[in-house]
Structures are given as structure tokens and as C-alpha cells.
């Protein structure tokens, strides 16, 4: 699959069709909180969802009104095929960062600053739904509300801050849909993940299990980010 990289498109206010995106709370939960929950979801699974090579991990840990999609560790370009129950909102990470406290205590403000650094330099971001661009991704930067514990039930778990570009899609009509993502940072001074790229595609079958391409057994071994 070719890497989807392009200049960030200009936002058009003249769209005649209703936007498939929302920034309104879903289930009484803000978009920022949903992104924190996404990181908890990704951290708590036996296999990292962002290492999914082809969609075999789509159902992993899914619960509630929002269905989590996954990006990658920036080292491969998957095409994933999934069945999604009808009526689910879809949370899609475009490109993002998270920083944790590890061994040395770090203030929440410092974690937030570290999570923000690459996201201040978005070089390119394109998201296509069924071949149609979803607008200017610079408008979809989401920061966590302060910092959060990576385990919501453990007050002593790692403190984290997240920052990046996300979209929340309204429930899609039943049937087959494609989501294509291409994004990259361009931090002038370099540094960790400063040239990170995302390039991945989902084929989503909403509300049906027909026509899903058969996949191999078990996840492939891919390097952690």
C-alpha cells in the first residue's frame, strides 16, 4: 500500500453533506476523555492493537458506544478488515503521542509539554472515508484533560499525558466502508519520533459478517514503538 502523504488540505466551509465527524460528547464523555480511554484500552490488552497486521485484533477489548480503531507504531503499513456492530461511534487516531512517568517523578505540566512537542509540527495529515477527504486535520487536535492514570482503577499506576490528532466518526451506515489515513510530523530540530509517519487503511463491514477476507491465525511479531 502506498504511503499516503500530502499537504494538509485547506478546510472548506461549503460542504453540502452533513459531516460524518463529531466533537460532541458521546455517552456523556468528552472527546478528550475518550482519547485517554483509548490509551488505557491499548495499554491493557495482551497484544498491542496498533500492531494488528490485518484486522484479526479488531474485536479486542471493545465495549461501550465507541469502537476503537488503531494506528501503528510507524514501522509498517497495514490494511485491516473488520466487522463493526451497527450503531457504534468510531474513534480513529490519526497521529499522536503519549508520555508517561516511568522511574523518575515528572510533573503533569512536563508530561504535557513532552506530548505536545511533535504535535506542534504536523507536516501532513489526510483521512479519507470512502475516498472522500474528511477536511483539515489541524482542526482535530485533541489533548488529554490534564494528566490521567493509565489504569483508572489504580491511583498509583503511571501518570500520563496525551496529545495528537483524532477523529470521532458518527455511526456509519450498514455496509462496506474504507478509512485511509496518512500523516507525518516534521519537527525541524529532530528528536524522538520527530519524523513519525502513519499510513494505514481499514475496510469496515458495518453490521454484517459477509465478504470479510479470511486471515491467518495469530498476530505477527512486530517491534513495539
What are these regions (language model features)?
Residues 92, 177-179:
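A short tyrosine-centered beta-strand micro-motif
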Residues 66-148:
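Extracellular-facing segments of soluble proteins and assemblies that are Gly/Ser/Thr-biased and enriched
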